[in-house]
Amino acid sequence: MNVKIEESWRKRLQEEFDKPYFEKLVAFVKSEYGHANVLPPGHQIFHVFNSCPFEKVKVVILGQAPYPNPGQYYGVCFSVPEGVAIPGSLANIFKEIHQDLGKPIPTSGNLDRWVAQGVFPMNSVLTVRAHETGSHRNMGWEIFTDAVIKKLSEERENLVFMLWGAYAKEKAALINSSRHLILTTVHPSPRSAEYGFFGCRHFSKANDFLRSRGIQEIDW
């Protein structure tokens, strides 16, 4: 199957695109876009892939499902477009960065600046019906994004994987911990951040690891 995605990713994921589950997933997603309000706009489904080539990835942040409110999600996990109110989880991420590294808290929730440096924030599920949280779960996206994680683990070295919350922590089984740094804690959601996300210092730990491997750190 021919999927419009950045070339370095296409070469590594073509095997997935040709599998029966992905063909079924594409048929489902096309049907959904045809009769429902689905997020993000179709051309933005692979935005984070198109913005961060495979060989440029340094830090992987795993999320679960897209924001379900129109105007929020554009293909980058936790991020929102310029001018959109910063969601609670992202506000807590910024708060932890401020406490960890002393960085000022941004007024914009757009994380494209991170992506340009090699941060790869990816949801496990890449589409959602508007106002219906998790409505596209168990349709095949999880199989695909698990394959992405495995590819990164197998073909790259010295990556940082940030796994926040019980769901993301399960993905540690897909990652070779002898080749990469795996950082886990609770989700930054306002419901859970105070139980371990605040004070986790994942952002300084990531930079310390990258520096120790001779890799340019992230300007969070």
What are these regions (language model features)?
Residues M1-L13:
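Generic N-terminal amphipathic, Lys/Arg-enriched alpha-helix
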Residues V3, E15-L163, Y167-E170, I175-N176, ...:
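A polyanion-binding, active-site-adjacent surface
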Residues G199:
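Short, conserved glycine- and acidic-residue-centered signature motifs
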